[in-house]
């Protein structure tokens, strides 16, 4: 695990400039109806104060998923420091059937040992359901906490946790030589660092499926251009810089292709590049505007936005040819879809009754659920496990990032401290 921790973040931290003006989650709608769980402050064994509140990070992760409602620390019936000290009856009396305990120990070499145990207090009282231990340096303590959260989440839900993922987003600052910045942070806004800064707009970041690259749009040459940047060394590869519009990049799940929109022939149309050969082929062709591609898991089909019926709606097309099929019918218009990793659902920007919100559509049954309640919501991006969505919305004269669980129960805001934040993109598993 120690090696995995180093590999996952080492390549990012080699060159990136860490920023101090970070975004932070502010809860706007809680999860009182979610499954209650106990998360006890982790025992600290070392000099002075604990370097991180690991237990607090685990509790926040579980709350952010929308599936759990951690008991407030002031209401904990006991504060056990190990699985053996957990008294199941004290917790089950509060309706809690699982408790997380843990320990953080300072090692002589300056590293830390982070251990956790998930204890059953319901069905099989006192049974340890999951446990783990990680040896990490100080800078990876939050990552170790997220690793514990992932394990607990998966054990209790059967769904792989996505708390060790990251988000990319664009920040527009007021003034300065380089007011546009592409940044990456942990999913919860911590450990933010700079990927690229520019005097001209940056747009539409998109992750490669292995998390090693970001595609995005830049206007630094005087017109739009699509580029792919390798995070480990900052190397930039230009993909497209045709006359007029070059935008909306999306890597295929198998990593072999990049879809994007070009208007070099007049109307916006979809194209796909084979990243190995560099060959580009046109997917859609017509007078309508076709843009915002999102891949289905087979790497052969795309969801995309088209105005061929008059107003923007989401369609599906095979990249090898065929007639696009419309897949959204509710509301006045739907656009900017993001298809889940299993291909069963998608999130999108849906407009109805003068409101523009983030909605989720079941691609098998067709049902639509509005998830957000903020203002002028746009650019939704799903977590790789499909349980959370990050998106941008308008607030005052600027824009901020928001988080909502895909069941709509948990909502939070990630306010920036030094500029407008937009165009979020959730990373794959790292």
From Swiss-Prot:
Keywords: Cell cycle, Cell division, Periplasm, Signal. Residues 1-21 form the signal peptide. One of its GO terms (cellular component) is periplasmic space. Coiled coil: none annotated. The keyword Isomerase does not apply. One of its GO terms (biological process) is protein import. InterPro entries: 6-blade_b-propeller_TolB-like, PD40, Tol-Pal_TolB, TolB_N. It is found in: Periplasm. Gene3D superfamilies: TolB, C-terminal domain, TolB, N-terminal domain. Belongs to the TolB family. Part of the Tol-Pal system, which plays a role in outer membrane invagination during cell division and is important for maintaining outer membrane integrity. TolB occupies a key intermediary position in the Tol-Pal system because it communicates directly with both membrane-embedded components, Pal in the outer membrane and TolA in the inner membrane. The Tol-Pal system is composed of five core proteins: the inner membrane proteins TolA, TolQ and TolR, the periplasmic protein TolB and the outer membrane protein Pal. They form a network linking the inner and outer membranes and the peptidoglycan layer. This is Tol-Pal system protein TolB. It comes from Klebsiella pneumoniae (strain 342). The lineage of its organism: Bacteria, Pseudomonadati, Pseudomonadota, Gammaproteobacteria, Enterobacterales.
């Amino acid at each position: 695990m120690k090696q995995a921790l180093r590999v996952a973040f080492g390549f990012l931290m080699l060159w990136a400039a860490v920023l101090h003006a970070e975004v932070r989650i502010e809860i706007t709608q809680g999860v009182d109806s979610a499954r209650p769980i106990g998360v006890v402050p982790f025992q600290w064994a070392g000099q002075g104060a604990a370097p991180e509140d690991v237990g607090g990070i685990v509790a926040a992760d579980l709350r952010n998923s929308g599936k759990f409602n951690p008991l407030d620390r002031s209401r904990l019936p006991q504060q056990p420091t190990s699985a053996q000290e957990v008294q199941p009856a004290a917790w089950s009396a509060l309706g809690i059937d699982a408790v997380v305990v843990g320990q953080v120990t300072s090692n002589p070499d300056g590293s830390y040992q982070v251990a956790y145990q998930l204890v059953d207090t319901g069905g099989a009282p006192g049974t340890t359901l999951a446990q783990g231990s990680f040896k990490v340096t100080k800078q990876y303590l939050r990552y170790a906490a997220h690793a514990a959260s992932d394990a607990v989440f998966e054990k209790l839900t059967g769904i792989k946790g996505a708390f060790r993922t990251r988000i990319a987003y664009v920040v527009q600052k007021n003034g300065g030589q380089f007011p546009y910045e592409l940044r990456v942070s942990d999913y919860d806004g911590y450990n933010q660092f700079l990927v690229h800064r520019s005097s001209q707009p940056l747009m539409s970041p998109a992750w490669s499926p292995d998390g090693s690259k970001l595609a995005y749009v830049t206007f630094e040459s005087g017109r739009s251009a699509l580029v792919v940047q390798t995070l480990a060394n900052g190397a930039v590869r230009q993909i497209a810089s045709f006359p007029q519009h070059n935008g909306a990049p999306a890597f295929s799940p198998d990593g072999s292709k990049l879809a994007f929109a070009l208007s070099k022939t007049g109307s916006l149309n979809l194209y796909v590049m084979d990243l190995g050969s560099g060959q580009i082929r046109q997917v859609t062709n017509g007078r309508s505007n076709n843009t915002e591609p999102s891949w289905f898991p087979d790497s052969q089909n795309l969801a995309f936005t088209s105005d061929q019926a008059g107003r923007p709606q989401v369609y599906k097309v095979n990249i090898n040819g065929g007639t696009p099929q419309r897949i959204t019918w509710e509301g006045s218009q739907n656009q900017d879809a993001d298809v889940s990793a299993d291909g069963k659902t998608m999130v999108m920007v849906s407009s109805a009754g003068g409101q523009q919100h983030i909605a989720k559509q079941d691609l098998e049954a067709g049902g639509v659920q509005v998830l957000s309640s903020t203002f002028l919501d746009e650019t939704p991006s799903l977590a790789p496990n499909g349980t959370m969505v990050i998106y941008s919305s308008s607030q005052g004269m600027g824009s901020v990032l928001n988080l909502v669980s895909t069941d709509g129960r948990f909502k939070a805001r990630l306010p920036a401290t030094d500029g407008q934040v937009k165009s979020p993109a959730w990373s794959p598993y790292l």
